[in-house]
Amino acid sequence: MKKILLSIILFFLFSSISYAGPCLTTIASASTNQLACADDDILNVTSAGSITYNDHKAVDLEDETGVQITNDGTIETEDGTNKQKAIHAQSSLNTTITNNGTINSDNNEGIYIDYAENITITNNAGATISAEAGNAIEGRNVGWCDKAGNNDNCQSSLSSSGSTAVGLILHNHGMISATQGTILLGTGGGGNPRSRGVKIYNYDGGTIKSTSGNNPIIAKYLTDSEIINYEGGTIESAGRYGILAENGSNITIDNRGTITSDRNTIYCRECSGVTFTNSGTISSTNTGTNTGTVLIDRQGDSDDAHTITNSGTIESAFGAAIQIARNTGGTTIDNTGTIKSSTAAIGAGRTKNLTINNHGTITSTGENDTGHFGIGFGNDSTSVEAGENVVLNNFGTISAINGDADGIKIGDYHANKNFDDLTINNSGTISGGDNSIVMANSNNTGLEIVTKGEGTYNGEIELNSTNTTMTLDCSISKDQKIEIHNKTNMVVTNNLCGND
């Protein structure tokens, strides 16, 4: 009997000093123990409760399925410990995390979700998910646990079937912050790691920001995903990149709120099949360097077509507001809002299969005739062809009226840097401080300028002796005064029908 009693005492003694506890519980006071979850556990932390752990993984649900966490208090790695992963959900499945309080890492990775499948995180108004260093939320290969070609990193129940193709679903109404890489969903060179099936929704009052570095959202190679920043939502970078989705495919980015960065606010270089919509404000603040506030597929390839729709404001303190140079797979830009830069509003150099429909305002406030223009159809190469099936339909205003700036620049000031096969249909106003339209290269071919309706040119059209067709459309509805210079090889097509 004494031996049995001693065994019971020792059992409870060692149980009481264990640093791991079951996750199927409610924490209503301060706890310093790690919680290790099992499948289908439900963890509740009340507003009076806290989990403050002095090592990595304050709450550990690696490889578990169906875990639900609701935090109204605090889940954190202890201040001053430099420990990571307040919540460790690697390779988990069907996880739900609802935060009404604070989730914080004293180092990196507030919530760690590498290889997780079908994980929903809701960060409500007044709540915070943060990391004192980088990555408030980190999830490499989310929704793609078998990307390496095997199922080794998938949750155990997926060991035979592999990935569900459903990644992170994030609903943010509160604050998500880190020094940099605030939400990290893939950085891998060569395509590994990468995530898919991601849905990020940042609602009115929600903020996703980096406090001292780049990338509030970094998701290289992201695929089959969408990011929506709603009216009243903010994505804010202290450095470069607001949303970095380089090498992504089949992505929807919809901004109805505010996205700001130092430069390259939306960066989707070498992307395929991007649908980008802006009805809010997107801006970059760097006054000395910027390759594009919105840069989509600046790569010489024929990837799936992109659609860019702007009814809000896209502006750049320096460099192109929209940069689509070198895209040949097909891009459509529909603008009913404002696109503005101190240098070049839209950079469309070396493009093919491009259509720009402007019903709004495209403006450069620059003053020189080399890099300051409303739209630039340029060519920075002497060996690569530029232009083919490129159409500009202008019903609004395209202007660069300061100094020697040009409304539209075509080709480059170099003998072999020409831009060909471009049609401009102008029913609106094109204005330049020097030229409304300038053929910067005398070798440009296959060019046509069609004047329609109320089409107006403020500033001469400089043809530079190119073989350009000037077409006067039957729809012209007012008297025209078009000043054309160096028109030696100009061809005029007169389709006027009673208005001449």
What are the functions of these language-model segments?
Residues A36-D41, D60-V67, D79-G80, A86-T96, ...:
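Right-handed parallel beta-helix/beta-solenoid
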Residues M1-I4:
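Positively charged n-region of N-terminal signal peptides that target proteins for export
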Residues G21-S29, I42-D55, Q68-K83, N99-N107, ...:
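Beta-strand-rich solenoid/repeat architectures in extracellular/passenger domains
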